[in-house]
A protein has these predicted regions:
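Generic detector of well-ordered alpha-helical packing
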Residues: 2, 25, 41-44, 75, ...
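DPxDG-like acidic metal-binding loop motif
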Residues: 31-90
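Short secondary-structure boundary/capping segments
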Residues: 13, 27-29, 72, 97-101, ...
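An extended, acidic
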Residues: 98-216
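Residue-level signal for inorganic ion chemistry
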Residues: 1, 12, 45, 74, ...
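N-terminal subdomain of lithium-sensitive/metallo-dependent phosphomonoesterases centered on the IMPase/IPPase/PAP
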Residues: 1-42, 205
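Short loop/edge segments at beta-strand edges and connector loops
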Residues: 23-25, 93, 141
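Short loop segments at secondary-structure junctions
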Residues: 62-66, 76, 85-88, 94, ...
Length: 216
């Protein structure tokens, strides 16, 4: 984590002079109006340590308080997901879009509140409710990867009760530019200094139903 974050921080600051970088190990203190890189050098650290092969590198650029540009790279499959607001979403140079599957035929990704087990009971309730009404559950434990997969139609639903800014900053622009819907709950803008709950879906109808379940 430390070596990759140091490498990315150096490259990104050179790419955009004056920008700040935050991640799991960074010390920059951002404020409103800053151009800010939000990075996760190894999203899915436990997967990486155990050689499961599901980890990614995630880089997001936050502009005016919102994720504006995002890159998610999956080295095990040499897959580069990327998007810039207003310019579409891509996977290895090919335009991508969310799937058109309805709720009953959707797959849900959720990591079961890995960071705080106190939230496990409500997570179980929500996941079970969604699982009963959808097609299947996929819990690989790599937030940025799962969100990027939604953008290219591999999954349709995402819910996590507590993740950190660097887990989602890179993937949010990719989902939105691919036609999907994503929302950070209980927040007016993208939080930079605290964890948050997040939901996402491939369609407006699926998003509305998922949010209804989560908010009950």
């Amino acid at each position: 984590d430390l070596a990759v974050e140091e490498f990315l921080t150096d490259k990104l600051r050179n790419l955009l002079p004056g920008s700040l970088v935050i991640g799991e190990e960074s010390e920059d203190n951002p404020s409103d109006g800053d151009l800010l890189w939000v990075i996760d050098p190894i999203d899915g650290t436990s997967n990486f340590i155990r050689d499961i092969g599901l980890s990614v590198i995630s880089v997001g650029l936050v502009k005016d308080g919102e994720p504006y540009l995002g890159v998610v790279y999956q080295p095990y499959r040499d897959e580069m997901f990327y998007a810039k607001t207003g310019e579409g979403a891509y996977l290895n140079g090919e335009r991508i879009h969310v799937s058109d599957r309805d709720f009953a035929h959707s797959h849900l990704c959720s990591a079961m509140s890995l960071y705080d087990k106190r939230y496990a009971p409500p997570c179980v309730r929500i996941i079970y409710r969604v699982y009963r009404e959808s097609d299947d559950l996929r819990p690989p434990g790599t937030a940025a990867r799962e969100l990027a997969y939604m953008a290219c139609g591999r999954v349709e639903l995402y819910f996590e009760i507590r993740i950190f800014p660097w887990d989602a900053a890179g993937a949010i622009p990719i989902i939105r530019e691919a036609g999907g819907f994503v929302e950070i709950l209980y927040q007016d803008k993208f939080p930079l200094d605290k964890p948050f709950a997040i939901i996402g879906a491939n369609s407006e109808a699926n998003f509305a139903h998922l949010k209804e379940i989560v908010m009950e």
